[in-house]
Amino acid sequence: MNPPAPGAGPALRPFSLAAWQGEITAALPVDRLAAEVARLTDPGQAVRTLHWGRNFLYLVHLLLPAGELAAVVKQFRHDSRRRRLDRRWRGSRAARSLRAALAVEAAGVSTPEPLAFVESREPAGPAFYVCRHEPEGFEARYFFRALA
């Protein structure tokens, strides 16, 4: 999959906090960024657990100036040496997920709006991909499993 062409899709804005770094899209304001990142990266702030397995997906409500925005957070763990090396060489899975979602969106395929990725500054720390919650959506894997 090729990345979106320069200038295509939403502009990503990098951010850097004491324990976290990442990129956000213009959909997220920066005025309360530190507080929102603290909430996003705390699974205890989850409104609901969506999936618990290899990765953890949970629903949060972002507090934006225009009101609340329901978002899904996917947590990627980097516990093993292999995951840490992979993150070092290829970037975090959260960063790759954001770029893949932007590429899918740029290709005209309907996908939940990508909002951000956040990663720990610690090599073994977690990373998080954040997108808009689509309550009427479905996971593509169920569609492909039904075809098999």
Please report, for each region that a protein language model flagged, where it lies by residue:
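Juxta-kinase regulatory segment immediately upstream of eukaryotic protein kinase catalytic domains
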Residues: 1-47
